[in-house]
Each structure stands twice: as structure tokens, then as C-alpha cells.
A protein has these predicted regions:
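Glycine-rich flexible loops
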Residues: 21-295
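Residues marking helix boundaries in flexible regions
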Residues: 13-15, 23
Length: 295
């Protein structure tokens, strides 16, 4: 895995513009926050290695509010305030690590604080400001990510992370209409291997194709995330939520493995049998698999 390098420069606004001062990173002296950012860097390395993160593809947002001490809360903005595009009342005063727009996952894996930033949601719940380490503008999919974070807080969930990526096999399946109807894709993926049932027990939700970065796509995703931890955007990619970024990655990875098994079987010339409905129910019952989000 790539080494993780902490950014040491911060841009402090002064009269007349921005001046760069060499200062310590927000991660220094905050081991909890540093561990979260290092985990994000680790996951982005996996995304690149799997071929899910071409160029600057994919986005990550993680709630890091619990690690913000009084010094962090007093940090000034280092870039102009930006509008989110919607009002999200649960996010007032919350802090998030966000991947930067146009930034590559493979670069974030090595330099997380040069390819992402810590943002603070303003008191109007409709705008945000960057506080560290550098004025890296967040992902263009920020409205979707923050809408999901708002929902998670509203429902009292312990989930902190949202991940958008482009898993090859799952995106390929979204080009086939059969898999976009009802719960057909979930049924097929669950039937490929018992671990899919065990580690992605809420299946996968389907969102019809929508314009990337649009509020409409965010709203459609929010509806599906109420019942699923992983949502597939038709002909685009997945959005996953999890207790941390590794959890969101793992659920996506498990579903993609099942899709790969399905395609391997199809490449042998036959439609795979899959586990029977009875066999899948037995797995669910014996292992008492959850039908709702665990927290």
C-alpha cells in the first residue's frame, strides 16, 4: 500500500488575499482523526488497484465531527464559503473529510490532505467552508453525500461514511434491463455465494440513470438508501454508506465479487443456477441476518 503523507501547509486568509504559511497539519496531535484519514487513504488505494477509480472517478465523505476539539472549531475558513444547493438541518456545525473535486484516488492514497480537505457546515445549514489543510474544493457529488449524511444523523444512525465508486461488474450489470427491475439484481447477487447474504444483507438498491451531480440524483439516492446500504446508479456506479469507509468499501466489494462470479459462470456458456430461495432463507435464519441497518 502507498505510504501516507500528511500535508503541512495551510492557507490563511488575510487582507488582500491568501497567503501560504507553513504550519502543522490538522492531523498532528489528533491520533483519532489521523487514523480515520489514513483509513480513507488505504481504501482509496484499494479502489485504484481494483480499477474502480479511473482518473478522478469516485468520491468519499466521512463525518469527523467527533474528532474536532476547540482549536479545530476556532480555525478560520481558508477559502470562500460555498453553497451546498439544499438545506440540511442536521449538519449545522458538523465537520467532514471530503475528497477533492478532480483529484485522483491513487494520489489521495499517498497524500490524503493534498487531495481532500476538512470542511465545516455553516450555521445556515446550506453552505460550507474549508478549514484544513489546503483549499481543496470538495467533490462535485457533495450534495448527494451530504444529503445522505443528513439522513444518517436524522435517523440516529452510527454510520459515518459515504463512498461513490465505479465497480466494473456492477456497472456492467446495470446496462441489462432485467437486473434493473424490482429486486432481481439483489436476488441474483445473493444467490451466487453465501457471504453476499452475510455481509451485504440489505442487498442493493437501483436508481435509474440521472445526471451526475444533480439534486434529482441525490434525492433518488436518498430514497433508496433508506432500505439499502449500497445503491447502484444505472450506467454509472455505486453509492455505499457504512460505519466507516472500510465498511462501505467492504459491502461494495462483496456485491461486486458476487457479480464477478455470475459473469464467470455466464462466460462458461450457461446461466448460473445460484442458491435456491430455500437455501438463502436457511442462511438468513441460521445466522440471524439483519433486515435493517444495525445502527
Amino acid at each position: 500500500m502507498f505510504p501516507h503523507h500528511v500535508g503541512l501547509s495551510r492557507h490563511i486568509p488575510i487582507v488582500g488575499g491568501l497567503r501560504t504559511l507553513i504550519m502543522k497539519s490538522i492531523l498532528e496531535g489528533r491520533p483519532g482523526l489521523e487514523a480515520v484519514v489514513n483509513q480513507i487513504a488505504e481504501v482509496t488505494g484499494y479502489l485504484w488497484q481494483k480499477g474502480w477509480a479511473e482518473r478522478n472517478g469516485g468520491n468519499i465523505t466521512v463525518n469527523v465531527t467527533e474528532f474536532m476539539d476547540e482549536e479545530c472549531k476556532a480555525m478560520p475558513a481558508i477559502a470562500p464559503v460555498k453553497q451546498i444547493g439544499m438545506v440540511l438541518p442536521q449538519l449545522k456545525g458538523k465537520y467532514f473529510y471530503c475528497k477533492g473535486t478532480g483529484k485522483r484516488m491513487r494520489d489521495l492514497a499517498r497524500w490524503p490532505m493534498q487531495n481532500g480537505s476538512i470542511v465545516r457546515i455553516c450555521d445556515d445549514c446550506a453552505s460550507y467552508e474549508i478549514i484544513a489543510d489546503e483549499p481543496v474544493m470538495p467533490t462535485s457529488e457533495l450534495p448527494t453525500h451530504l444529503a445522505l449524511q443528513n439522513y444518517l444523523l436524522e435517523t440516529g444512525s452510527c454510520y459515518k461514511a459515504t463512498l461513490h465508486t465505479h465497480p466494473i461488474e456492477l456497472v456492467a450489470m446495470s446496462h441489462i434491463q432485467r437486473f434493473l427491475k424490482g429486486d432481481e439484481m439483489t436476488r441474483v447477487l445473493w444467490s451466487m455465494i453465501p457471504e453476499t447474504l452475510a455481509f451485504a444483507p440489505l442487498g442493493i438498491g437501483i436508481v435509474p440513470y440521472g445526471l451526475p451531480s444533480s439534486v434529482e440524483l441525490a434525492e433518488a439516492t436518498l430514497e433508496k438508501i433508506k432500505k439499502h446500504d449500497v445503491v447502484l446508479w444505472e450506467k454509472h456506479g455505486t453509492v455505499a454508506v457504512g460505519q466507516d469507509i472500510m465498511d462501505a468499501f467492504d459491502q461494495t466489494d462483496v456485491l461486486c465479487k458476487a457479480a464477478n462470479i455470475y459473469m464467470c459462470a455466464r462466460n462458461m456458456g450457461s446461466e448460473p443456477d445460484g442458491m435456491t430461495a430455500e437455501a438463502m432463507k436457511e442462511v438468513q435464519d441460521v445466522f440471524n441476518l439483519p433486515k435493517t441497518r444495525p445502527c
